[in-house]
């Protein structure tokens, strides 16, 4: 992996580049401390701080991400069956897995999902039971796991 910046340098965030620039997200620049070696061409004679482009990423457990993706695909498949329609026609509802994982018990999770599916005319018990089985043991994705 490439060097992400000099030790002790400050990270500066810049807004996302304009359309047509080929880049999609915000850029992060690392500023070298004054007098640091490798200040780039021109050395200390440059007018502004030397900026070096780097990437910042948040690491999530790939296995957990794969489980979450599979779960979301399963949920979509089940909802199309429950509502007897195409994915685009499913009523506006959001089953927040992280919210369910925060709840104390399966009973409260089941009650929450039942609230969300109140407009569904087909029986939802099998879906709710399957969903609770699938999320058991999963981890929240809102904060990365430290290794």
Curated annotation (Swiss-Prot):
<dbReference type="GO" id="GO:0005737">
    <property type="term" value="C:cytoplasm"/>
</dbReference>
<feature type="modified residue" description="Phosphoserine">
    <location>
        <position position="32"/>
    </location>
</feature>
<comment type="function">
    <text>Inhibitor of PPP1CA. Has over 50-fold higher inhibitory activity when phosphorylated.</text>
</comment>
<dbReference type="GO" id="GO:0004865">
    <property type="term" value="F:protein serine/threonine phosphatase inhibitor activity"/>
</dbReference>
<dbReference type="GO" id="GO:0045087">
    <property type="term" value="P:innate immune response"/>
</dbReference>
<dbReference type="Pfam" id="PF05361">
    <property type="entry name" value="PP1_inhibitor"/>
</dbReference>
<dbReference type="GO" id="GO:0019212">
    <property type="term" value="F:phosphatase inhibitor activity"/>
</dbReference>
<dbReference type="InterPro" id="IPR036658">
    <property type="entry name" value="CPI-17_sf"/>
</dbReference>
<keyword id="KW-0963">Cytoplasm</keyword>
<feature type="modified residue" description="Phosphothreonine">
    <location>
        <position position="57"/>
    </location>
</feature>
<keyword id="KW-0175">Coiled coil</keyword>
<feature type="modified residue" description="N-acetylalanine">
    <location>
        <position position="2"/>
    </location>
</feature>
<feature type="region of interest" description="Disordered">
    <location>
        <begin position="1"/>
        <end position="55"/>
    </location>
</feature>
<dbReference type="GO" id="GO:0019888">
    <property type="term" value="F:protein phosphatase regulator activity"/>
</dbReference>
<feature type="compositionally biased region" description="Low complexity">
    <location>
        <begin position="1"/>
        <end position="15"/>
    </location>
</feature>
<feature type="modified residue" description="Phosphotyrosine">
    <location>
        <position position="29"/>
    </location>
</feature>
<protein>
    <recommendedName>
        <fullName>Protein phosphatase 1 regulatory subunit 14B</fullName>
    </recommendedName>
</protein>
<dbReference type="InterPro" id="IPR008025">
    <property type="entry name" value="CPI-17"/>
</dbReference>
<feature type="modified residue" description="Phosphoserine">
    <location>
        <position position="21"/>
    </location>
</feature>
<comment type="similarity">
    <text>Belongs to the PP1 inhibitor family.</text>
</comment>
<keyword id="KW-0597">Phosphoprotein</keyword>
<feature type="coiled-coil region">
    <location>
        <begin position="61"/>
        <end position="103"/>
    </location>
</feature>
<keyword id="KW-0007">Acetylation</keyword>
<keyword id="KW-0650">Protein phosphatase inhibitor</keyword>
